[in-house]
Amino acid sequence: MIYPNPSSNNQDAVVNLQKHVVLNVPRERWLQAQRWEGDLWKSVNRPLRNAAKRVLQHIGLRTREVGDDWNHWWAERLDRYQFVPSHVENAIEFGCGPYTNLRLISNGRTIDHAYCSDPLLHIYLNFRYTWLSESYRRQRVLVDDHPMEQCPFASDFFDLVVLINVLDHVHDASDCLRQAVRVTKPGGLLIVGQDLTSEEDLALPEVRSDIGHPIRVDHQTLDMFLQPTFRPILYRILSRDDGREPLAHYGTYLFAGSKG
């Protein structure tokens, strides 16, 4: 399903938000979500489990790097990133997680300087045999552990900015969206993928009590931040039934745009 694009002339004016939209939370609530996220991935990446994966690799039953967090799912729905140029000078993925989407975007492409940014990198870089940890060890990626709200990079710097499955984990989604817009170079690409929440979704106890995802956004809010500045190359909103978690999210936002 594709929804119409509402227009806006001011990405800084967050007005008339529906009560199901939660764009910022207290710092302690965000830290609670971060602890939950870190504990989740540490449990997934236990040493014995990774050792078993390495054995499978040696006998030819798996590829070199291990781990995936719906990254292939997002890639399929974002047209396998066919709109991304074959050569990118500077690229960054915010909220890259332990497995990253850049690992798929970089396939068949040359990225001169690839940055992976996540406040939990001190955990993720200790995981063995992931694309992120292996690429960092070989000095193929640069890393940054600032919260996205405190992004240290220069304005208009990146040719490619990736923000997939991130906003529901942050402290202040408005600040994060402004940072994504700010650091994208004129003519550069911004890719956004995000689960969406409605009033109907938020009425569910299991959604309201979700520790790891304190932020809730809808497609109108994302359009308000992105549409004034970016020319859409890809714009889709998947229906509830086509999303990853149909019981919790009314849709999935898919966007790629060139900064004007």
List each model region and its residues.
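Class I SAM-dependent methyltransferase SAM/SAH-binding core
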Residues: I92, G97-Q150
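Core SAM-dependent methyltransferase catalytic element
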Residues: T229-G260
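Class I SAM-dependent methyltransferase Rossmann-like catalytic core
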Residues: Y3-V84
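A short acidic, Gly/Pro-enriched loop at the edge of an enzyme's catalytic core
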Residues: H146-V161
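Short alpha-helix
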Residues: G212-F230, L234
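A short glycine-rich, Lys/Arg-flanked "PGG" loop and its adjoining helix->strand segment in the class I
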Residues: S174-L189
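A short SAM/SAH-binding and catalytic strip from SAM-dependent methyltransferases
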Residues: L160-H171
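Conserved class I S-adenosyl-L-methionine
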Residues: I191-Q220
